[in-house]
Amino acid sequence: MDRVLVASYPINHLIRPHSFRIDYCWSTCFTSRLNSGKERQKLSSRWRWRSMASDSTDSSSSSSFAPSVESDPSDKTSASFCIIEGPETVQDFAKMELQEIQENIRSRRNKIFLHMEEVRRLRIQQRIKNAELGISKEERENELPNFPSFIPFLPPLSSENLKLYYVTCYSLIAGIILFGGLLAPTLELKLGLGGTSYEDFIRSVHLPMQLSQVDPIVASFSGGAVGVISALMVVEVNNVKQQEHKRCKYCLGTGYLACARCSNTGALVLIEPVSTLNGEHQPLSLPKTERCQNCSGSGKVMCPTCLCTGMAMASEHDPRIDPFD
């Protein structure tokens, strides 16, 4: 009976003190339940859990980084585990158990979508602040990586400046051909330099004879430079094509679509009925506008295809990266 009183003390304070009948019935039922061994084990485990919870709450008050008692133990294991810590260290997860793998997948998937939602809201606030500050020039947001140019003194590669690369490439090739085919032979003829090693070959293919006076070093330099520049241009074009394939087809890499409710203006025109009194003609008042509730005044809404990322692949279930294909 002493055990009953000690065990029932912290629970009786939740019941109103004047309800003696409820206390008596509860103590009677509690005494009968103590007779079974299974219920006694459940009770001891319950009290042990409460003591551990009280200890953990005390420790969490002293340290701000201590985990809460109500958190799932799977979150603790997933938080302490990291498959890729950095570009240098990659941990092997082949020895993990199935339950542990599922917990880590669930935890990381939730974190990914939480970060994507935070990015979406931050972008909306950024557009709202730009509209409030009167910044009308909107730069096209593109988070795809910029490929550095292989050709010196040229800006990073993108689909916008691809024409600049074509003009630069063709200009360099034309300049090298003019230098090796016309300028260098003319200078060598005037200076009395050059050799006759190519004379028979030039005569056999019916080319101008002044090409036979070209120095072999100049000829090899011109041909090699043209080949290298052509190869680099092919690499640049392939990078542009790969960048376009990674971009979302609907929003073109911006992550946003035009709001259909406000027609990309960010404001709605309030239409009020016009009433006339006694047939008098009065000038109409200016229409009133309010901020669009659909896009919060930004004029843009989230692209549902890429989930505001601008990338064509927004899910881990993409058939292009299927490891079992």
From Swiss-Prot:
CXXCXXXG motif repeats lie at residues 259-266, 303-310. Residues 226-317 are annotated as: CR-type-like. It is found in: Plastid, Chloroplast membrane. Residues 53-71 have a biased composition (Low complexity). CXXCXGXG motif repeats lie at residues 248-255, 292-299. The keyword RNA-binding does not apply. GO terms for cellular component: chloroplast; chloroplast membrane. Keywords: Chloroplast, Membrane, Plastid, Repeat, Transit peptide, Transmembrane, Transmembrane helix. The chain crosses the membrane at residues 164-184, 217-237. Residues 1-54 form a transit peptide. Residues 53-77 are annotated as: Disordered. The keyword Chloroplast applies. Belongs to the orange-like family. Involved in chloroplast differentiation in fruit flesh. Its sequence is related to the DnaJ family but lacks the J domain. The CR-type-like region is similar to CR-type zinc-fingers. PANTHER family: OS02G0651300 PROTEIN (PTHR15852:SF24), PLASTID TRANSCRIPTIONALLY ACTIVE PROTEIN (PTHR15852). This is Protein ORANGE-GREEN, chloroplastic. It comes from Cucumis melo (Muskmelon).
